[in-house]
Amino acid sequence: MIHSKKLTLGICLVLLIILIGGCVIMTKTNGRNAQIKENFNKTLSVYPTKNLDDFYDKEGFRDQEFDKRDKGTWIIYSEMVIEPKGKNMESRGMVLYINRNTRTTKGNFIVTEITEDSKGYSRSKEKKYPVKMENNRIIPTKPIPDDKLKKEIENFKFFVQYGNFKDFKDYKNGDISYNPNVPSYSAKYQLNNDDYNVQQLRKRYHIPTKQAPELKLKGSGNLKGSSVGSKDLEFTFVENQEENIYFSDSVEFTPSEDDKS
């Protein structure tokens, strides 16, 4: 009887230890997930910045990577990628380097087409059109004979100018992951077509699917903040071997480099 009681007590003790350990792990995971979501929320707080000139006076996260005299450079990038079934993949997007030291902005409108040859090898053809930004206007810096393309470049709007994540804290059922070895972290949320940002993308781009996208937020670097690393977001409408439709965007604050172009 005594042996039986000791055995029962031992089993209960082991179960209690497992239960406590599980609670500790769950608490740590929930705390880290909340930290990841808050980290992304800070990044998304710059959306929307309708006037790109406002970035000249907008301060970002600074660490030891920055020279004390360097005010930093904002790098903004937006790209739409469409690969219909049986057709080539094409991406059209723009990147700008907004230098807060010189208060000048330059970048490129980039068109990339990926084809597949008879042997199944992928071939990438990229064309860059240099631009500058003045008074919130995109201006090509070299002649563009194609009027339609010129108009597309001049009328280009970055997602940061119209995207809005004021309700991000209310996003539910996210799939949040963390890899401490890189370190990297991500969050995924299934959206619907009534979502404001989805409606804005459909308004500006011909998106050949009615399927609602998944929002993917990806980051790397120290969760507490670092200028080394990156954060970007992606609206994935379709992703498979035959068809790909997605929109990607990033806004980063980095130490300035004079040779950016």
Curated annotation (Swiss-Prot):
Family per record: Belongs to the staphylococcal tandem lipoprotein family.
Keyword check for Heme: no
Signal sequence range: 1-22
Compartments where located: Cell membrane
Per the record, its GO cellular-component terms are: plasma membrane
Q: What membrane topology does the annotation report for this chain? A: Lipid-anchor
For this UniProt record, the keywords arranged alphabetically read as follows: Cell membrane, Lipoprotein, Membrane, Palmitate, Signal
**At which residues does the record annotate a lipid attachment of kind N-palmitoyl cysteine?**
C23
Using the UniProt record, give the first listed, main subcellular location: membrane
Protein name, entry field = Uncharacterized lipoprotein SAUSA300_2428/SAUSA300_2429
Q: Which organism is it from?
A: Staphylococcus aureus (strain USA300)
Lipid anchor positions (S-diacylglycerol cysteine): C23
